[in-house]
Amino acid sequence: MDVIDPHSVNISYPASFSVDYIRPEVVLEIGPLAAWVPSASHRIRPYAAEEFPQLFAEPECRVIATSAERTFWEKATILHQQAHRTGPMPLRYSRHYYDLYKLAASPVSTSAIADLGLLRDVVAFKQRFYPSGWARYEDAVPGSLKLIPANAHLAELQRDYNSMQVMIHGQIPDFDEIIIALRHLEDQINGLVE
């Protein structure tokens, strides 16, 4: 259990290499402040099962996870919150920009954008459990959603993104490419004024 947050479980593991940006631990947020609706059951297969199949009697298992559409709106509202931040950007937040960039380039984007009720649910959840006047969650709706922070924060985000690239498998998109795609997504969502 996390000593500061009793609703989080920290699982530490031995690191096989040393990179300051990557902490050798996984944090599971399991308390009442985590929303599980909607969710689905998914079959997963770890990379280790591909490399060492002889070590796995059953290389696949099922996990229940929050839907990708909810994750899309969770990430969008995190970016909306950060777009209204007046102080310095927190560390390790560029991952949320990368995540939404990847989700926006997938079929998940179409189904998430078609479900504005889910956006309203995510906003209501954040207003109740993560209240913040400066986040302006009430404006996280088509017509006023902001995904891109002020220019002053973009340099901070780019530095953070440059540090986090060791976490990305495969092709690493340029930071400017991510921002351009997110500006397009912001325009697309804001064009859906209800």
Residues covered by each model-derived region:
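Structured mid-to-C-terminal alpha-helical surface segments
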Residues: 1-194
